Amino acid sequence: AGCIIHGLMDEQDLRKMGGTIRLLPMSYIMILIGSLALVGFPFLTGFYSKDVILEVALTKPSSVGNFTHWLGCFGAFCTSFYSFRLIFLTFINTTSSNKDYIENAHDAPVKMAVPLMILAVGSIFWGFFSRDAFLGFGTPLFMNTITTSFENLVSIDAEFASSSLKNIPFFLTVLGSVLSFLLINCSFSSKGVVFDYKMT
């Protein structure tokens, strides 16, 4: 987000952006990777960390566990909605930006791009290479840390939870992204009322 603000002359209003995918390609790729990891896209880091928390909450035999699970699922939906709203409004939607912002737009300089690339690599690969520590029985780390306490044995139940229940967060994530796209298209049409904004 900082790279985008910096590249568009400190503009922070999403409604005054749009159409910057060709002007800020590196920023677009980094924000896309970060957003996908944040919403728990399969096989990215956020997928492993988010889903294991929700599954453990679901299999905890208490009303608090069930409430926590559904609250987390709602959070996954909201996260997907606002993350993809950011991408659509900033990069993909028809531009509503000031002419000066477009003419002077520039992608992130090297000193800003390098840390983003390091974080992007971590977002893509860290969850995959560390997944056994959280999702399986194949490593001493899993056996010696997570299940040391009797209370943490519920994480074993999460391994064998119903697939249909495990897929709920993923479906809500997809629903959030689709609704974001539909509402943005609606709002920028002549009858849009959700994010209606008249540029001056």
Question: What is each of the regions a protein language model found here?
Answer:
Residues 7, 47, 90:
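Conserved catalytic core of Hanks-type protein kinase domains
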Residues 34-43, 126:
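Transmembrane alpha-helix interface/packing and boundary motifs in multi-pass membrane proteins
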Residues 36, 94-96:
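Acidic glycine-/aspartate-rich tracts in secreted/extracellular proteins
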Residues 78-85:
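Residue-level signal for the membrane-embedded core of alpha-helical transmembrane segments
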Residues 16-29, 48-75, 97-200:
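Membrane-interface segments at transmembrane helix junctions and kinks
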